[in-house]
Amino acid sequence: MSLRLGAISSCTTSSPFPVLQVLLPLSLLLTTLVPATMGAAKIEGRMAHVELRCLCLNTVSGIHPSNIQSLEVIRAGAHCAKVEVIATLKNDKKICLDPEAPRIKKIVQKIMEDGGSAA
């Protein structure tokens, strides 16, 4: 270390630009990651991802009720303008049912009357 008055520390001569070159990409990365994690919501003590689109693209209008293991009815909302009915079959396959089909309406009504055990 020098005690001369004309000596300049290396800290004062370094440019702040390398720090900015690191902070800018880091801040851009964080701005893309934070909104992606905000889509997760805590429901009944577990984490569930909130989809902001309709889940059912194609629907089936005819299925035998004995093939259905469970049924999930998703109301229309900001995520989707229509009601969605998703059935989990006994072979663990999930299919979307047409909520407007008379047969599907009867299946949903029967399950709701039975106490919603297949909800």
UniProtKB/Swiss-Prot annotation:
Proregion residues excised on maturation: 34-39
Location(s) in or outside the cell: Secreted
Pfam short name (any one): IL8
MF terms in GO: chemokine activity; CXCR chemokine receptor binding; growth factor activity
Disulfide bonds, paired cysteine numbers: C54-C80, C56-C96
Top-level lineage group: Eukaryota
SMART domains membership: SCY
Signal sequence residues: 1-33
GO annotation, biological process: antimicrobial humoral immune response mediated by antimicrobial peptide; cellular response to lipopolysaccharide; inflammatory response; neutrophil chemotaxis; positive regulation of cell division
Record's keyword terms, sorted: Chemotaxis, Cytokine, Disulfide bond, Growth factor, Mitogen, Secreted, Signal
Coiled coil location: none
UniProt GO cellular component terms: extracellular space
Functional note: Chemoattractant factor for neutrophils.
Family the entry assigns: Belongs to the intercrine alpha (chemokine CxC) family.
Protein name: Platelet basic protein
